[in-house]
């Protein structure tokens, strides 16, 4: 037995007899997962808590339950609290629970334990992150050595059997020879603590480190958050529903951002092309994985130490870590006090939260409610969910929809263009590789020529906006790209279209002189600044007014520089935006709106769980489908080898996808890659490695899958494939980081080749493609818990990025329990592509695929699936889209279709439809108008229905209970 600082092996001859650790039950998905905001750390039922003793803050007892056995408790070295190694009613041991929730990772054993007062650390390098640590046995029997997973466990050593490295944490608790399990008698005396209490106690400790379980026992009243509705009586009810959810999300985002202070960082200094100082810093994997950072985020960098007077500077993030480099780069704003560039250590960085995006969403809701000119009457009532008469625009259609010297449209694309040009509201569903960007660009081109008016083109992300702006530029349109001030120094593929660059290039006279003076001096006088701002604003307005198309993000549409009306708004990737986000460009005076997206792929990212559960994670695109608005689907895919498109087409698009490329066009001749079936470039390679907790304690990795991933990439390199052609997709940040590290340490070819291979999340690959995709599933445990691999949308994206070849690495035993993955495995088996063995000797996999058990869940009519926790099975319809009524994203569609078996509901729908048929008849004389945009006209024409509609809304709410009669629908 040795102390922590001596870096000598641990003598375990007197330790518990089970030191020869057998493969243990694997980690459960109830551990917190990165990018998984809906997942809970714990899922167990509440347990009674009376009659047990409370832990004492003055001794070495568990801060959760009070167990004080020296052999069972471990100290968290960050907060100096003690925790036991038992689960006792929770999904993870108390010490692991605490480490995960607190983001701590250094522990030490009790002085009276078998191993003594020992800080657990790596024998070679001294790293103390317990989530990184594992053990290997010495060639002599009675000694083990602790090594970190990477790099030390990857280093060959004659004295240690590093191939047998095992993590110290298995089954979500420390191995029993590190910290024993308490006796049954000790468990009975301990206080039972619920997962909910643990979460509250950890939150309490952030503000009061001396808090105990007694401080959180008092029940707290929490205001109930009503779910969003399908239909709204008026815009005020709409605003009252969405406004609180936006505030919830904003408050959560603010708390998250402001908690991300980075202390004791080392900085390297350089100069940007504009002569501004750049501060670059690298964080540990643990720290960088926890950060939620985007290009353009504002930060404060400051120094306080003995070597220089206190200094503080502000700037914007201009570069983030990626597959090719691991640094964050901050561009500092000009300041009278220069930064201490001669210093590199002792700096602290803090993020500045800005609620601009949330403020603009709230403003859009208010504008929608009170400004009748913000949107046409037709669109107003459509968004509220009222049944209004469909109208069409009497516009001259082009003889040919395809544009000369541009991509030729197929029939489904031409149909989409024709439909959109004549309708005030259109939904275009673009499955993977179907050319929705080409279709969108063609639509914008024709609308610009027909109406001779500016068009506002938006998307949730800057990448999507830039991509579409480039296409529109290629069509010869005058395109202006509006970016946030914080992103003006970030280079992109369309920087030449950026408004600030157009202002600089077109500056004349006084403005040109002021720009030159500003560049030379760095700062203008107060009077010059005032004049400069005025001239810039005037020039910006002139440029925007002369544009054919203005491109910006949805949030960017709320910029004051766009304080004008736009008749036509097109939103690309609209299914990735929340509804209030989409509303920002729409309330710029829209009379014609085109939403482009795919609700079978990834949806909006909502961090606050309550807001997500209440419905904020549903896009406007999806809700309109639920209201019966049928999207136009693009049906010809040009990306994937037809063998790769077969399963996604049948599973997610009712087999409607046609192939615009042949097998020959997507087959590499003379390839020597060992595909199981020659001519079918896909395989599911069964991997039976164990999942492990990653370095940050909140994610997962799988070493066997990472090792085989490197072997596949090396094999592709030897087959002539370039690094830029390969993409590795994994849902877990822990696996992403580990694969990058593993390839650099163990790749058998030039290390620079492996650096150029992109390894990223499913989200990062949405809308993109690679010639070859490797999908690492990671999850492998006896509980068959697969986390957010259950989300069909994530699987759809992962399966549809590859053009020439797809390799899936996963454990079929764990995945087969899920209905969707079961179908996928059966598909690969039927094709002869479900294999196991070594890459050079693949054999058909003989593992038995256990039939998944269907789950029956009762939900109210308007309820949504919690994608991460409830998507175990499909809705029981004959197809997977049910005529755009029920999608895998879990949205229940039109009542008249979804519940046709219920007489009362059918009668209700029919009566409502009859009323609106009368309205339609009365309105028919106005159907041929080019545009109906007077909200008062609709109000007058529909006044006889308003009171009926209000009553029907109330009846609709009362019918929630009827959903219990429809459990046979499986939704």
Curated annotation (Swiss-Prot):
Swiss-Prot/TrEMBL catalytic activity: ATP + H2O = ADP + phosphate + H(+)
Result of changing residue 484 to H: Decreases binding to substrate
Alphabetized UniProt keyword annotations: ATP-binding, Cytoplasm, Helicase, Hydrolase, Metal-binding, Nonsense-mediated mRNA decay, Nucleotide-binding, Phosphoprotein, Zinc, Zinc-finger
Region (Disordered): 1-22
Gene3D superfamilies documented for this protein: 2.40.30.230, 6.10.140.1240, P-loop containing nucleotide triphosphate hydrolases
CDD domains: 1B_UPF1-like, DEXXQc_UPF1, SF1_C_Upf1, ZBD_UPF1-like
PROSITE patterns xref list: UPF1_CH_RICH (PS51997)
Annotated GO biological process: cytoplasmic RNA surveillance; DNA recombination; intracellular mRNA localization; nuclear-transcribed mRNA catabolic process; nuclear-transcribed mRNA catabolic process, 3'-5' exonucleolytic nonsense-mediated decay; nuclear-transcribed mRNA catabolic process, nonsense-mediated decay; protein ubiquitination; regulation of translational termination
Compartments reported by the entry: Cytoplasm
Coarse class of the protein's main subcellular location: cytoplasm
Chain positions covered by the region annotation C3H: 62-94
One Pfam assignment: AAA_12
EC id: 3.6.4.12, 3.6.4.13
Region annotation (CC/SHH/C) ranges: 76-104
Keyword Acetylation: no
Gene Ontology molecular function: ATP binding; ATP hydrolysis activity; double-stranded DNA helicase activity; mRNA binding; ribosomal small subunit binding; RNA binding; RNA helicase activity; single-stranded DNA binding
Residues the record lists as binding ATP: 413, 433-437, 601, 638, 769
Binding site for Zn(2+) 3: 122, 125, 148, 152
Domain Upf1 CH-rich: 54-208
SUPFAM superfamilies: P-loop containing nucleoside triphosphate hydrolases (SSF52540)
Region (C4): 122-152
Remaining remarks: Present with 6090 molecules/cell in log phase SD medium.
Family of the protein in this entry: Belongs to the DNA2/NAM7 helicase family.
Function comment: RNA-dependent helicase required for nonsense-mediated decay (NMD) of aberrant mRNAs containing premature stop codons and modulates the expression level of normal mRNAs. Also capable of unwinding double-stranded DNA and translocating on single-stranded DNA.
Name of this protein: ATP-dependent helicase NAM7
Provenance organism: Saccharomyces cerevisiae (strain ATCC 204508 / S288c)
């Amino acid at each position: 037995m040795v102390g922590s600082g001596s870096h000598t092996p641990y003598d375990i001859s007197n330790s518990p007899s089970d030191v020869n650790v057998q493969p243990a039950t694997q980690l459960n998905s109830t551990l917190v997962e990165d990018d998984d905001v809906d997942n809970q750390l714990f899922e167990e039922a509440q347990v009674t808590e009376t009659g047990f003793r409370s832990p004492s803050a003055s001794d070495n007892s568990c801060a959760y339950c009070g167990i004080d056995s020296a052999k069972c408790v471990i100290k968290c070295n960050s907060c100096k609290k003690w925790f036991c190694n038992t689960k006792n009613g929770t999904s993870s041991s108390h010490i692991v629970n605490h480490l995960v929730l607190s983001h701590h990772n250094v522990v030490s054993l009790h002085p009276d334990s078998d191993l003594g007062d020992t800080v657990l650390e790596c024998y070679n390098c001294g790293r103390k992150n317990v989530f990184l640590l594992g053990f290997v046995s010495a060639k002599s029997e009675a000694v083990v050595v602790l090594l970190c997973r990477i790099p030390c466990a990857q280093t060959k050593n004659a004295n240690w059997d590093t191939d047998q490295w095992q993590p110290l944490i298995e089954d979500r608790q420390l191995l029993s020879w590190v910290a024993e399990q308490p006796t049954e008698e000790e468990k009975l005396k301990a206080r039972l603590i619920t997962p909910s209490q643990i979460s509250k106690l950890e939150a309490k400790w952030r503000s009061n480190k001396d808090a105990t379980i007694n401080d959180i026992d008092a029940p707290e009243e929490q205001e109930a958050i009503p779910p969003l509705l399908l239909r709204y009586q008026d815009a005020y009810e709409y605003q009252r529903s969405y406004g609180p959810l936006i505030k919830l999300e904003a408050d959560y985002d603010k708390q998250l951002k402001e908690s991300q202070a980075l202390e004791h960082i080392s900085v390297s200094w350089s100069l940007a092309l504009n002569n501004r100082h750049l501060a670059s810093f690298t964080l540990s994997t643990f720290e960088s994985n926890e950060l939620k950072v985007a290009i353009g985020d504002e930060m404060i960098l400051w120094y306080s130490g003995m070597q220089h007077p206190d200094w503080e500077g502000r700037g914007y993030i201009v570069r983030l870590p990626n597959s090719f480099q691991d640094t964050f780069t901050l561009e500092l704003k000009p300041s009278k006090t220069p930064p201490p560039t001669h210093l590199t250590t002792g700096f602290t960085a803090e993020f500045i939260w800005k609620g601009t995006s949330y403020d603009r969403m709230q403003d859009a809701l208010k504008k929608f409610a009170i400004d009748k000119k913000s949107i046409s009457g037709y669109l107003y009532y459509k968004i509220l969910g009222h049944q209004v008469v469909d109208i069409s625009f009497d516009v001259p259609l082009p003889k040919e929809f395809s544009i000369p010297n541009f991509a030729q449209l197929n029939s489904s694309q031409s149909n989409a263009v024709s439909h959109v040009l004549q309708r005030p509201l259109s939904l275009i569903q673009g499955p993977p590789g179907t050319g929705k960007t080409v279709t969108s660009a063609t639509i914008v081109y024709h609308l610009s020529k027909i109406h001779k008016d500016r068009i506002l083109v938006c998307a949730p992300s800057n990448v999507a906006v830039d991509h579409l702006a480039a296409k529109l530029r290629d069509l010869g349109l005058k395109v202006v790209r509006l970016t946030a001030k914080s992103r003006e120094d970030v280079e992109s593929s369309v920087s030449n279209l950026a408004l600030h660059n157009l202002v600089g290039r077109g500056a004349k006279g006084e403005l040109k002189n002021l720009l030159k003076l500003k560049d030379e001096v760095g700062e203008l006088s107060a009077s010059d600044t005032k004049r400069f701002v005025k001239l810039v604003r005037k020039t910006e307005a002139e440029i925007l007014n002369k544009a054919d198309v203005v491109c910006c993000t949805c949030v960017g549409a709320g910029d004051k520089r766009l304080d004008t009306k736009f008749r036509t708004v097109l939103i690309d990737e609209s299914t990735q935006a929340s509804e209030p986000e989409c509303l920002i460009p729409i309330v710029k005076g829209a009379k014609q709106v085109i939403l482009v997206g795919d609700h079978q792929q990834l949806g909006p990212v909502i961090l606050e769980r309550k807001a997500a559960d209440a419905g904020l994670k549903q896009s406007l695109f999806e809700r309109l489908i639920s209201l019966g608005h049928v999207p136009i689907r693009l049906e010809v895919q040009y990306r994937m080898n037809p063998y790769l498109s077969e399963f996604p087409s049948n599973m997610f698009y009712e087999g409607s996808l046609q192939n615009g490329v042949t097998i020959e066009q997507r087959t590499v001749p003379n390839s020597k890659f060992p595909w199981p079936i020659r001519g079918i470039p896909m395989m599911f390679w069964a991997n039976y490695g164990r999942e492990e907790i990653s370095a940050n304690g909140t994610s997962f990795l799988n070493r066997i899958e990472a090792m085989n991933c490197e072997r596949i990439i090396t094999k592709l390199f030897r087959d002539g494939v370039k690094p830029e052609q390969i993409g590795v997709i994994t849902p877990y940040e822990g696996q992403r980081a580990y694969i990058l590290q593993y390839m650099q340490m163990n790749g058998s070819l030039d290390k620079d080749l492996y650096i150029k291979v992109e390894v990223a999340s499913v989200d990062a690959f949405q809308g993109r493609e690679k010639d070859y995709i490797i999908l690492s599933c990671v999850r492998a445990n006896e509980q068959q818990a697969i986390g957010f691999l259950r989300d069909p949308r994530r699987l759809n994206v992962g399966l549809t990025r590859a053009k020439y070849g797809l390799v899936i690495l996963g454990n079929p035993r764990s995945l087969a329990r899920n209905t969707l993955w079961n179908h996928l495995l059966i598909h690969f088996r039927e094709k002869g592509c479900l294999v196991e063995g070594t890459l050079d000797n693949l054999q058909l996999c003989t593992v038995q695929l256990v039939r998944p058990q269907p789950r029956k869940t009762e939900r109210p009519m308007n309820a949504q699936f919690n994608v991460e926790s409830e998507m175990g099975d499909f809705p029981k319809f004959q197809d997977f889209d049910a005529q755009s009524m029920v999608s895998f994203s879990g949205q229940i569609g039109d009542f008249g279709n979804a519940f046709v078996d219920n007489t009362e509901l059918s009668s209700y729908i029919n009566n409502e439809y009859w009323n609106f048929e009368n309205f339609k008849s009365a309105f028919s004389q106005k159907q041929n108008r080019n545009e109906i945009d007077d909200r008062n006209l609709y109000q007058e024409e529909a006044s006889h229905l308003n009171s009926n509609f209000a009553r029907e809304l109330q009846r609709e709410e009362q019918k929630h209970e009827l959903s219990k009669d429809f459990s046979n629908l499986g939704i």
